């Protein structure tokens, strides 16, 4: 019985099996990184929702006047921070600063605030899988 090359064949088979194991390990690491990034984005979204809620609580007159009833998009900076803002200007600044931070922290990040009269709904939306469509969101309700 000739066994020439049999050991080489065993080594090649072991190498193929080992290669599949390494590929599976690499896929596991990539998936773990994806889940970690997703959790980070959700944490940022939660922090951002609480940020605008705190800004709203700090500007009671702005809430009473309805200045926070429909925040969406990036808005504009009213330029009054150094000179003193009215409650309406402060609400405008809060919306601008908040959505600027959403865009900086989250991929395709944006936020909106809506109300049904007594309850404010704060929504932070971002593109979690980076396919171009903002498809993940964090919703928080606030009753000031």
Pin down the residues of each PLM region.
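Flexible, low-complexity segments enriched in proline/glycine/serine and punctuated by aromatic residues
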Residues: 13, 37-39, 46-144
């Amino acid at each position: 019985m000739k066994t020439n090359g049999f050991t080489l064949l065993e080594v090649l088979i072991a190498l193929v099996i080992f290669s599949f194991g390494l590929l599976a390990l690499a896929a596991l690491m990539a998936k773990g990184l994806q889940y970690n990034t997703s959790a980070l984005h959700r944490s940022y979204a939660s922090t951002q929702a609480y940020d605008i809620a705190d800004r709203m609580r700090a500007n009671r007159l702005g809430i009473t006047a309805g200045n926070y009833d429909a925040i969406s998009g990036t808005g504009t900076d009213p330029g009054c921070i150094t000179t003193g803002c009215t409650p309406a200007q402060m609400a405008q600044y809060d919306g601008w600063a908040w959505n600027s931070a959403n865009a900086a922290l989250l991929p395709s990040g944006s936020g909106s605030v809506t109300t049904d009269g007594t309850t404010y709904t704060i929504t932070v939306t971002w593109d979690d899988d980076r396919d171009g469509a903002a498809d993940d969101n964090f919703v928080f309700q606030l009753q000031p």
